[in-house]
Amino acid sequence: MRAASVPIDVRATYIEYMDINLTHPAPAFFISHGAPTFAMQPGQLGPVLTAAGRRMGAIKAALIVSPHWMTQGVRVASTPAPDTIHDFGGFPEPLYQIRYRAPGAPDWAAHAVQLLQSAGFAAEPDAGRGLDHGAWVPLRYLLPEANTPVFQISMPRDFDTAAAWRMGRALAPLRAQGVAIVGSGSLTHNLYEVFHGGKEAPYAQAFANWTSQAVLGGDIDALLHYRAQAPSAERAHPTEEHFLPLVVAAGAAAEGEQAQLLPGGMTYGVLAMDSYAWGLPLPEAA
Protein backbone atom coordinates (compact mmCIF):
# COMPACT_ATOMS: atom_id res chain seq x y z
CA MET A 1 0.00 0.00 0.00
CA ARG A 2 1.39 3.41 -0.93
CA ALA A 3 2.09 5.60 2.06
CA ALA A 4 0.06 8.79 2.25
CA SER A 5 3.21 10.93 2.06
CA VAL A 6 4.27 9.63 -1.37
CA PRO A 7 2.86 11.80 -4.19
CA ILE A 8 1.50 10.33 -7.40
CA ASP A 9 2.23 11.71 -10.85
CA VAL A 10 -1.37 11.22 -11.93
CA ARG A 11 -0.94 12.07 -15.61
CA ALA A 12 2.19 9.92 -16.01
CA THR A 13 0.50 6.99 -14.30
CA TYR A 14 -2.59 7.36 -16.47
CA ILE A 15 -0.56 7.47 -19.69
CA GLU A 16 1.43 4.42 -18.57
CA TYR A 17 -1.76 2.42 -18.13
CA MET A 18 -3.27 3.63 -21.40
CA ASP A 19 -0.24 2.09 -23.17
CA ILE A 20 -0.62 -1.40 -21.67
CA ASN A 21 -0.83 -4.21 -24.22
CA LEU A 22 -3.64 -6.59 -23.29
CA THR A 23 -3.50 -10.37 -23.59
CA HIS A 24 -7.17 -10.93 -22.69
CA PRO A 25 -10.24 -8.85 -21.76
CA ALA A 26 -10.33 -7.42 -18.27
CA PRO A 27 -12.49 -9.38 -15.81
CA ALA A 28 -15.79 -8.45 -14.21
CA PHE A 29 -16.25 -8.90 -10.46
CA PHE A 30 -18.89 -8.82 -7.80
CA ILE A 31 -17.23 -8.21 -4.44
CA SER A 32 -18.92 -8.34 -1.04
CA HIS A 33 -17.32 -5.40 0.76
CA GLY A 34 -18.68 -6.24 4.21
CA ALA A 35 -18.38 -3.79 7.08
CA PRO A 36 -15.87 -0.90 6.88
CA THR A 37 -13.64 -2.85 9.27
CA PHE A 38 -12.94 -5.25 6.39
CA ALA A 39 -10.30 -2.68 5.41
CA MET A 40 -8.26 -3.70 8.47
CA GLN A 41 -9.52 -7.25 9.02
CA PRO A 42 -9.02 -9.21 5.77
CA GLY A 43 -10.64 -12.38 7.05
CA GLN A 44 -11.12 -15.12 4.46
CA LEU A 45 -11.90 -12.88 1.49
CA GLY A 46 -9.00 -10.41 1.63
CA PRO A 47 -6.26 -12.85 0.55
CA VAL A 48 -8.61 -14.36 -2.05
CA LEU A 49 -9.09 -10.93 -3.64
CA THR A 50 -5.36 -10.20 -3.58
CA ALA A 51 -4.66 -13.50 -5.32
CA ALA A 52 -7.39 -12.70 -7.86
CA GLY A 53 -5.79 -9.32 -8.51
CA ARG A 54 -2.46 -11.00 -9.26
CA ARG A 55 -4.11 -13.48 -11.63
CA MET A 56 -5.95 -10.67 -13.38
CA GLY A 57 -2.74 -9.36 -14.89
CA ALA A 58 -2.41 -5.99 -16.60
CA ILE A 59 -5.51 -3.83 -16.97
CA LYS A 60 -5.88 -0.22 -18.06
CA ALA A 61 -8.37 0.88 -15.40
CA ALA A 62 -11.00 -0.35 -12.98
CA LEU A 63 -14.60 0.85 -12.90
CA ILE A 64 -16.49 0.28 -9.65
CA VAL A 65 -20.21 0.55 -8.87
CA SER A 66 -20.99 1.03 -5.17
CA PRO A 67 -24.35 1.25 -3.36
CA HIS A 68 -22.92 4.01 -1.18
CA TRP A 69 -23.25 6.52 -3.99
CA MET A 70 -26.87 6.88 -5.06
CA THR A 71 -27.99 9.80 -7.22
CA GLN A 72 -30.72 11.13 -9.44
CA GLY A 73 -29.73 9.59 -12.74
CA VAL A 74 -26.23 8.14 -13.10
CA ARG A 75 -23.05 10.01 -12.21
CA VAL A 76 -19.61 8.95 -13.39
CA ALA A 77 -16.65 10.20 -11.35
CA SER A 78 -14.15 11.98 -13.59
CA THR A 79 -11.76 13.44 -11.03
CA PRO A 80 -8.07 12.80 -11.87
CA ALA A 81 -7.12 12.18 -8.22
CA PRO A 82 -10.11 10.87 -6.23
CA ASP A 83 -10.20 11.42 -2.48
CA THR A 84 -10.76 8.60 0.01
CA ILE A 85 -14.22 9.13 1.49
CA HIS A 86 -14.82 7.82 5.03
CA ASP A 87 -18.60 7.66 4.79
CA PHE A 88 -19.26 5.91 8.12
CA GLY A 89 -19.21 6.66 11.82
CA GLY A 90 -18.49 4.97 15.13
CA PHE A 91 -15.57 2.82 14.01
CA PRO A 92 -11.98 2.64 15.33
CA GLU A 93 -9.93 5.77 14.64
CA PRO A 94 -7.21 4.00 12.58
CA LEU A 95 -9.86 3.24 9.97
CA TYR A 96 -10.26 6.96 9.30
CA GLN A 97 -6.54 7.35 8.66
CA ILE A 98 -6.53 4.97 5.69
CA ARG A 99 -6.04 6.57 2.29
CA TYR A 100 -6.36 4.76 -1.04
CA ARG A 101 -4.46 7.03 -3.41
CA ALA A 102 -5.10 5.53 -6.82
CA PRO A 103 -5.25 7.90 -9.78
CA GLY A 104 -8.56 8.59 -11.47
CA ALA A 105 -9.44 7.82 -15.07
CA PRO A 106 -11.20 10.85 -16.57
CA ASP A 107 -10.92 9.69 -20.19
CA TRP A 108 -12.38 6.28 -19.39
CA ALA A 109 -15.09 8.01 -17.34
CA ALA A 110 -16.05 10.08 -20.39
CA HIS A 111 -16.25 6.91 -22.47
CA ALA A 112 -18.46 5.26 -19.83
CA VAL A 113 -20.79 8.28 -19.89
CA GLN A 114 -21.18 7.86 -23.65
CA LEU A 115 -21.92 4.14 -23.35
CA LEU A 116 -24.50 4.72 -20.63
CA GLN A 117 -26.19 7.54 -22.52
CA SER A 118 -26.37 5.36 -25.64
CA ALA A 119 -28.16 2.74 -23.53
CA GLY A 120 -30.76 5.26 -22.38
CA PHE A 121 -29.34 6.22 -18.98
CA ALA A 122 -29.33 9.86 -17.90
CA ALA A 123 -25.58 9.81 -17.23
CA GLU A 124 -23.32 12.77 -16.47
CA PRO A 125 -19.69 13.18 -15.39
CA ASP A 126 -18.92 14.25 -11.81
CA ALA A 127 -15.56 15.97 -11.41
CA GLY A 128 -15.69 16.16 -7.62
CA ARG A 129 -16.50 12.65 -6.45
CA GLY A 130 -13.97 10.52 -4.60
CA LEU A 131 -14.08 6.83 -3.63
CA ASP A 132 -16.50 5.79 -0.88
CA HIS A 133 -15.80 2.79 1.34
CA GLY A 134 -17.78 0.53 -0.97
CA ALA A 135 -15.06 1.24 -3.53
CA TRP A 136 -11.76 1.70 -1.70
CA VAL A 137 -12.18 -1.05 0.88
CA PRO A 138 -12.34 -3.94 -1.65
CA LEU A 139 -9.84 -2.22 -3.95
CA ARG A 140 -7.28 -2.26 -1.10
CA TYR A 141 -7.18 -6.04 -1.55
CA LEU A 142 -7.86 -6.42 -5.27
CA LEU A 143 -5.41 -3.67 -6.33
CA PRO A 144 -3.27 -3.10 -3.22
CA GLU A 145 -0.56 -1.06 -4.95
CA ALA A 146 -3.15 1.65 -5.70
CA ASN A 147 -1.46 2.51 -9.00
CA THR A 148 -4.20 1.37 -11.41
CA PRO A 149 -6.53 4.21 -12.52
CA VAL A 150 -9.97 3.79 -10.97
CA PHE A 151 -13.31 5.56 -11.30
CA GLN A 152 -16.67 5.10 -9.66
CA ILE A 153 -20.19 5.03 -11.08
CA SER A 154 -23.25 5.84 -9.01
CA MET A 155 -26.48 3.88 -8.77
CA PRO A 156 -29.68 5.78 -9.62
CA ARG A 157 -32.20 6.01 -6.81
CA ASP A 158 -34.84 4.20 -8.86
CA PHE A 159 -32.46 1.30 -9.68
CA ASP A 160 -33.88 -2.21 -9.96
CA THR A 161 -32.61 -5.53 -11.27
CA ALA A 162 -33.68 -4.83 -14.85
CA ALA A 163 -31.85 -1.49 -14.90
CA ALA A 164 -28.82 -3.02 -13.19
CA TRP A 165 -28.63 -5.71 -15.88
CA ARG A 166 -28.97 -3.06 -18.58
CA MET A 167 -26.16 -1.02 -17.01
CA GLY A 168 -23.87 -4.05 -17.00
CA ARG A 169 -24.63 -4.75 -20.65
CA ALA A 170 -23.96 -1.12 -21.55
CA LEU A 171 -20.58 -1.10 -19.80
CA ALA A 172 -19.48 -4.55 -20.99
CA PRO A 173 -17.54 -3.26 -24.05
CA LEU A 174 -15.06 -1.61 -21.68
CA ARG A 175 -13.75 -5.03 -20.68
CA ALA A 176 -12.39 -5.69 -24.17
CA GLN A 177 -10.59 -2.35 -23.92
CA GLY A 178 -8.88 -3.31 -20.66
CA VAL A 179 -11.21 -1.87 -18.02
CA ALA A 180 -12.18 -4.22 -15.19
CA ILE A 181 -15.79 -3.84 -14.06
CA VAL A 182 -16.42 -4.24 -10.33
CA GLY A 183 -19.81 -4.36 -8.69
CA SER A 184 -19.32 -3.82 -4.96
CA GLY A 185 -22.12 -4.78 -2.59
CA SER A 186 -22.93 -7.57 -0.18
CA LEU A 187 -24.25 -11.06 -0.77
CA THR A 188 -26.48 -10.57 2.28
CA HIS A 189 -27.09 -7.24 3.98
CA ASN A 190 -29.39 -7.17 7.00
CA LEU A 191 -27.62 -4.55 9.12
CA TYR A 192 -30.21 -4.70 11.90
CA GLU A 193 -29.27 -8.31 12.53
CA VAL A 194 -25.56 -7.50 12.23
CA PHE A 195 -25.76 -4.89 14.98
CA HIS A 196 -28.51 -6.40 17.14
CA GLY A 197 -28.03 -10.11 16.65
CA GLY A 198 -24.51 -11.19 15.90
CA LYS A 199 -25.54 -14.84 15.95
CA GLU A 200 -25.37 -17.24 13.05
CA ALA A 201 -28.69 -17.42 11.22
CA PRO A 202 -29.28 -20.28 8.75
CA TYR A 203 -31.31 -18.10 6.38
CA ALA A 204 -28.20 -16.10 5.41
CA GLN A 205 -26.31 -19.19 4.28
CA ALA A 206 -29.39 -20.51 2.48
CA PHE A 207 -29.70 -17.25 0.54
CA ALA A 208 -25.96 -17.26 -0.22
CA ASN A 209 -26.15 -20.85 -1.47
CA TRP A 210 -29.13 -20.06 -3.70
CA THR A 211 -27.36 -17.03 -5.16
CA SER A 212 -24.18 -18.98 -5.84
CA GLN A 213 -26.17 -21.65 -7.63
CA ALA A 214 -27.80 -18.98 -9.81
CA VAL A 215 -24.54 -17.13 -10.54
CA LEU A 216 -22.40 -20.20 -11.20
CA GLY A 217 -25.18 -21.75 -13.26
CA GLY A 218 -25.62 -18.62 -15.36
CA ASP A 219 -29.29 -18.35 -14.38
CA ILE A 220 -29.84 -14.69 -15.17
CA ASP A 221 -33.62 -14.97 -14.90
CA ALA A 222 -33.24 -16.12 -11.30
CA LEU A 223 -31.03 -13.14 -10.46
CA LEU A 224 -33.43 -10.71 -12.10
CA HIS A 225 -36.32 -12.18 -10.10
CA TYR A 226 -34.43 -13.10 -6.92
CA ARG A 227 -36.91 -11.18 -4.78
CA ALA A 228 -39.62 -13.73 -5.63
CA GLN A 229 -37.45 -16.83 -6.04
CA ALA A 230 -34.65 -16.76 -3.46
CA PRO A 231 -35.24 -18.09 0.07
CA SER A 232 -35.60 -15.31 2.65
CA ALA A 233 -34.77 -12.66 0.05
CA GLU A 234 -36.42 -9.80 1.92
CA ARG A 235 -34.69 -10.77 5.16
CA ALA A 236 -31.32 -11.12 3.45
CA HIS A 237 -31.83 -7.77 1.70
CA PRO A 238 -34.42 -5.54 3.44
CA THR A 239 -33.43 -3.02 0.77
CA GLU A 240 -32.00 -3.93 -2.63
CA GLU A 241 -29.06 -1.60 -3.13
CA HIS A 242 -26.35 -4.05 -1.95
CA PHE A 243 -27.61 -6.85 -4.22
CA LEU A 244 -27.92 -4.81 -7.40
CA PRO A 245 -24.15 -4.46 -8.06
CA LEU A 246 -24.12 -8.25 -8.48
CA VAL A 247 -26.60 -7.90 -11.33
CA VAL A 248 -24.47 -5.14 -12.89
CA ALA A 249 -21.42 -7.42 -12.81
CA ALA A 250 -23.39 -10.35 -14.23
CA GLY A 251 -24.65 -8.07 -16.99
CA ALA A 252 -21.07 -7.17 -17.89
CA ALA A 253 -20.22 -10.85 -18.45
CA ALA A 254 -20.17 -12.26 -21.96
CA GLU A 255 -22.96 -14.64 -22.93
CA GLY A 256 -22.08 -18.08 -21.59
CA GLU A 257 -19.05 -16.80 -19.68
CA GLN A 258 -18.54 -19.00 -16.61
CA ALA A 259 -18.41 -17.29 -13.23
CA GLN A 260 -15.88 -18.27 -10.57
CA LEU A 261 -16.62 -18.29 -6.85
CA LEU A 262 -14.28 -16.20 -4.70
CA PRO A 263 -15.10 -17.66 -1.28
CA GLY A 264 -15.44 -15.21 1.57
CA GLY A 265 -17.28 -17.08 4.29
CA MET A 266 -19.71 -15.48 6.73
CA THR A 267 -19.04 -12.56 9.08
CA TYR A 268 -21.14 -11.36 12.01
CA GLY A 269 -23.22 -14.51 11.63
CA VAL A 270 -25.37 -13.06 8.83
CA LEU A 271 -23.09 -11.05 6.50
CA ALA A 272 -22.12 -13.35 3.63
CA MET A 273 -18.83 -12.37 1.97
CA ASP A 274 -18.76 -14.70 -1.04
CA SER A 275 -17.80 -12.89 -4.25
CA TYR A 276 -17.60 -13.79 -7.95
CA ALA A 277 -15.46 -13.17 -11.02
CA TRP A 278 -16.02 -13.55 -14.75
CA GLY A 279 -13.11 -13.76 -17.17
CA LEU A 280 -10.50 -14.15 -14.44
CA PRO A 281 -7.65 -16.51 -15.40
CA LEU A 282 -7.83 -19.72 -13.38
CA PRO A 283 -5.11 -20.46 -10.79
CA GLU A 284 -2.19 -22.43 -12.15
CA ALA A 285 -2.22 -26.09 -11.17
CA ALA A 286 0.11 -26.91 -8.30
Place the predicted regions along the sequence by residue.
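Extreme N-terminal basic, low-complexity initiation segments
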Residues: 2-8
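A short aromatic-anchored loop/beta-hairpin motif
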Residues: 18-115, 119, 123
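Flexible, glycine/proline-enriched loop segments at strand-loop-helix junctions
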Residues: 95-103, 125, 154-161, 233
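Internal, conserved structured core segments that host functional sites
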Residues: 109-163
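Short acidic (Asp/Glu) patches
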Residues: 45-50, 94-98, 130-137, 164-167
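Surface-exposed, charge/polar-rich loops and edge strands
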Residues: 114, 118, 148-149, 159, ...
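Short, positively charged and aromatic/hydrophobic N-terminal segments
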Residues: 7, 14-16
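Beta-strand elements within well-structured catalytic alpha/beta cores of enzymes
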Residues: 27-31, 61-66, 153, 174-187, ...
